[in-house]
Amino acid sequence: MARRALEGPEPLEGRTGSELPATLAPRSGNGGGSSEDSADHEGAQTAAPRVAVHATILRVLVTTLGDALLDVVVRLDEPLAVGADAGAVTKSGAGGQAANVAAWAVALGAEGRCIAKQGDDAAGRLVAAELESRGVELVGPAGGRNGIVVSLVGKDGERTMASDRGVAPELAPGDLDPVWLACDCLHIAGYSLLASPIDAAAFRAAELARLNGATVSVDLSAWTRIREFGPARFRRQVELLEPDVVFANEAEWEIVGAAYGLAPTAVVKRGSRGVLVLGEKRLELPALPGEVVDATGAGDALAAGFLVGGPELAVEAAAQCVARLGAQP
């Protein structure tokens, strides 16, 4: 968890609002230790949207590594039928787990940087422009075809995704500038551990971030991709990364074999039932009431909230996300 102070609503039980939970400190107290896995756009950040949550969050830098995709969200008025024409409401813009977490971090009052390989096509330029407008510093090589993800959203807000990651998995260790890893927290999309050379880039990024005293977190991402990759093989990838915090939904949690042993702190995303945090203490927080328009990106908003301000901010950010169409604030 980023080194920050959170002030505002009632503190979590057992700590004041300005304390950093000990379970979220880096594995190595001096910032080094693990062998495996800056925002300059201040002008853009002043114009970026902010989500009204807590009164004061000291500015920290959350760096993410993974995908910066073109996100096409299709909210269906009725179920699809082969050969038929179904009504829908659509929205397109920047997406991808790494991009989403960085954008939400900025919206919640932090600084956000996203490390990703981007396409040099129209989709890539659109994504880069939108992230910049949101105050996110997008860094990494550009070339080839940008990834696109299509999310089909039903009336209940649940989504089904079709993902084309484009050039994103081609990010290599040699593409990294150590300056990008001067941050408070490095958040790695689990998709980055499912392909090469981006997995090696993730491990190298974690090394560099820890040299700067940062914590490292990972979101296990899609259980279907983990199943295809091999759960035991994927778990080994996470173990090599040695994260301080692991995020997972319940399906991902189960398929990897209960992720608690993978990190000092585990955050289980339970949808409408809220969040479960396992560390030195067990903490359950319910989801906040409200209409669910679109669940796309809710887990990313939750992760950003947790890294910036802890569990309370996590559930608030998730509630903000599901109340609108699209994955970004």
Residue ranges and their predicted role:
Residues M1-E19:
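N-terminal helix-forming leader/targeting segments
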Residues I57-A68, A129-P141, V153-L283:
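Ribokinase/PfkB-type carbohydrate-kinase core domain
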Residues T23, V53-I57:
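Short, positively charged and aromatic/hydrophobic N-terminal segments
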Residues S18-E42:
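Polybasic, low-complexity intrinsically disordered segments
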Residues A107, T265, P286-P329:
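Conserved post-catalytic alpha-helical subdomain immediately downstream of the catalytic base
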Residues T56-I115, A122-A129, V149, P289-V292:
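Glycine-rich phosphate/adenosyl-contacting loop at the front of the ribokinase-like
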Residues R3-R4, R15, R27, R50, ...:
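Basic polycationic patches enriched in arginine
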